Structure formats: C-alpha cells, structure tokens
C-alpha cells in the first residue's frame, strides 16, 4: 500500500494519533510521518492538533475501497461491472480509462480516484478535485452504435445520475443542458462523455462523473460558479462515497443498456421533468457568437431547442446560460 494511503487509513477513524504512532504506521520514523502528513495538508486535508495528543483529521474521511463498492452493488450491476480500480491520485480517471480501453479493458470497467490533478469539465475547464472529499468516477462502455447516434448519451447518463441522487434524499435537483446537475442554481454534479471509434461503430465511450460530496470551503476558491455538495443537502447525514459510487453504477448501467437499445427517446419525458432551462430566456455561447432566445426542451438527438427571433433553432453544442435580468 502507498505510504500516504497507509497514513490515511490510520487517520481515517477521526481519533488523535501521535507523531510516533503515525511514523510507526508507516514503518518509519516520526520525521517521515510528519513529511507525509505535510503532503496530505498540501493535498487539501485539514487537521486538528491536540497538545499532547497528536493529530487527527478535522473530520473523519471514508476512503474509497473497491471491495466495499463491489459488495454494495445490486446483483445485476455486480455481474456486469468489470474491474474497479481505485487510486490515491491520478491526473484524470477518464484519461486512465481511455488508456486502458486501448489495452482491451472490458466494458463496464470503473476507475475512481481520491484526487485528480487534471480533472476537467466541458470546454477543458478544470474540475476542482480536492483530496478524499468528493466522488470522481469514470466508467468505460463499449457500444455497437455509430458515433453519430451517441450524441444524446450524456443526457441519458444525467437521468441515471438523477436517479442515483434520489436515493440520498436529493429530490430537488434539476438538469441543465447538457450535463450539469443543479440545486437552486448551484452545481452539485457534472458529466463528461468522450466517444472514440468508427463512424458506423463500434465505439468506446468513457463517462466521467464528478459529484461534490463534502467540498472543503478552502478548496472551492477556484470554482467560478455557485456550488453545493451532498453533505450540505443531506443535513446531519454524512454521505458514504462508497455507497454513492455503487448506487451510481446501479442506476447508470441500465440507462446505458436502454440507450443502446432505444436511444434517448425512452428518457425524453423524464428529462423534461428535470429540465431547468425549459421556458427560460437563455444565451447560447458559440465560438463566434452568442444567440439568445427561449429554451424549448430537447429533441431525440439531445440537441437543445431554442425559439429565437429568427425562428426555432437546435443546438448540438454550445454553452447555455440563463439570461441575466436587467
């Protein structure tokens, strides 16, 4: 086990541990324990120091564990899921899975990380990924569909994510086209889908999901939009990230199977129920211009429909935002 991971396992119970005990947990000196403790601080973890007691995490952290995730899966997902790989740090769970896909990784392989250095959202934006705080999960999916028919897949995946969140009492969330989950205008989660393969199929799909679970306020200073997290919404209940990962897979896998069979059509009504843009005045930011109008839902390909001064337009790409009211 990685030394930093071993130190985390020692600290994860929320109890105080002396410098000597931390060093001993690594089979090293107190000084070596202090060095790795400093590394955890730099990764964003907060500690309390008790005089004569030692160190403890400011709040206990449940570490991700592949076996705990697998054991929490429903029977169908447990049979379908391939390898579950959990890492302390990665540049990106999706990048790692894309590389594995080229080495014949099986469909429904899963990758998670406690921290990402290169996590990203749409248009290459950084996804803030503090250590052991949120859920960063990517799923590999092999599809026989043509690449052009997979345009609505990220929207269908959003339905799976919404179903997952309801298990944790998050019933007030909405979907913002194409891939954000918002609660009262604040971002809770996001999805990024990468598709590679032949135009006529088959295709390799990597679905990256980021869910804010327990975002440290200090780590959120680089986030440019309003945000929220699961623990804030759940009140006094601390959300288990292992259970959250398993529930997400339980809900996401049947959605992907249904999408392969029938496209986005089976999910249209459910999407419309959660569409936060429907009927709203929006701006669609394109590389060369911005188009304004009233959002009118989506079509069966996943494109956003907007009623503009020049008539109804459909957008398969772009950044949608609610128009500010002057």
PLM segments and residue spans:
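Long, positively charged amphipathic alpha-helical accessory segments at protein N-termini or as interdomain linkers
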Residues: 1-29, 35-38, 42-43, 145-173, ...
């Amino acid at each position: 086990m990685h030394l930093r991971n071993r130190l985390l396992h020692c600290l994860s119970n929320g109890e105080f541990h002396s410098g000597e005990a931390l060093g001993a947990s690594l089979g090293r000196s107190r000084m070596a324990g202090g060095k790795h403790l400093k590394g955890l601080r730099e990764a964003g973890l907060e500690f309390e120091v008790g005089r004569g007691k030692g160190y403890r995490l400011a709040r206990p952290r449940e570490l991700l564990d592949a076996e705990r995730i697998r054991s929490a899966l429903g029977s169908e997902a447990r049979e379908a899921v391939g390898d579950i790989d959990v890492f302390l740090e990665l540049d990106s769970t999706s990048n790692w899975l894309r590389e594995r896909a080229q080495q014949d990784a099986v469909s429904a392989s899963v990758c998670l990380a406690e921290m990402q250095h290169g996590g990203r959202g749409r248009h290459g934006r950084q996804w803030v990924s503090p250590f052991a705080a949120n859920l960063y999960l990517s799923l590999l999916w092999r599809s026989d569909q043509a690449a052009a028919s997979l345009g609505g897949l990220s929207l269908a995946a959003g339905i799976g994510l919404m179903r997952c969140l309801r298990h944790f009492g998050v019933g007030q969330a909405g979907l913002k086209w194409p891939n954000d989950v918002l609660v009262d205008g604040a971002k809770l989660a996001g999805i990024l889908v990468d598709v590679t393969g032949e135009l006529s199929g088959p295709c390799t799909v990597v679905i990256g999901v980021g869910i804010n679970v327990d975002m440290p306020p200090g780590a959120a200073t680089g986030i440019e939009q309003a945000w929220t997290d699961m623990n804030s919404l759940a009140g006094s209940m601390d959300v288990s990230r292992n259970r959250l990962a398993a529930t997400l897979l339980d809900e996401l896998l049947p959605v992907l199977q249904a999408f392969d069979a029938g496209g986005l059509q089976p999910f249209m009504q459910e999407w419309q129920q959660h569409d936060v843009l429907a009927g709203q005045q929006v701006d669609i930011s394109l590389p060369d211009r911005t188009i304004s109008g009233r959002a009118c839902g989506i079509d069966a390909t996943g494109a956003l429909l907007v009623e503009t001064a020049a008539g109804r337009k459909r957008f398969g790409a772009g950044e949608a935002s609610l128009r500010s009211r002057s």
